[in-house]
Amino acid sequence: MWSEKLIELTKDEAYEGSMMKKSNGKFGMIKSRGVESIEIVAVELKDFMPVPTDKVIAQYKNIDEMISDGWVID
């Protein structure tokens, strides 16, 4: 699905505020990344810039679970 390089980049650099892309073409932004949880929220465009909303679209226990579900850094 995704290249090993992109998966490793996601593991190293995907933190709060990172834009994410899912394998189905959906976009989101990491709202929080803690030791045991990652929360991705929907984004909306304002003045051509993606802005996070309060709508949670995905939650995971860890980065590997998130990547397995198809999310990587954009």
Go through the PLM ranges and name each one.
Residues 1-74:
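Terminus-proximal functional modules
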